[in-house]
Amino acid sequence: MNEVLFGSKNAERVLIYIYSRREGYAREIARFYDTDLKSIQNQLDKMEAGGVLVRREVGRTRPYTFNPRYSLLEELKGLLEKAFSFYPMNLRQELVMNRPGPNAKDSSS
């Protein structure tokens, strides 16, 4: 939808995913969009090198989040908010639905 602004479809996917879920890691993002893991990892690496994203170590995963020190963060989030509003409702709902982690307990038992 906005690949022209973001540079590529996968760059847009990475940014929208992290915008809507607050964080994400390469395999999770690639799986969500059913796309190539290497392409997503390349985008994450570029955005980390450019200071847009930061990565932290959590066990064996390395989730990425927006870099709070990125000088255009508020403007970027405003643009992403607007872009997100044009996504189909079903995709927006899937993006904001947070799945429990692998060690989460089922509270219904």
Predicted ranges, named:
Residues 2-11, 25, 58-80:
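Short, cationic-aromatic polyanion-contact patches
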Residues 12-16:
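Pre-recognition alpha-helix immediately N-terminal to the DNA-recognition helix
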Residues 18-21:
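Short helix-capping/hinge SLiMs at alpha-helix to coil transitions
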Residues 23-32:
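Short acidic, hydrophobic short linear motifs in intrinsically disordered regions
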Residues 38:
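Key DNA-contact positions within bacterial/archaeal DNA-binding proteins
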Residues 44-45:
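Short, hydrophobic-biased segments on the C-terminal half of alpha helices
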Residues 48-58:
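A short, conserved structural fragment
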Residues 71-109:
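Amphipathic alpha-helical dimerization/coiled-coil segments
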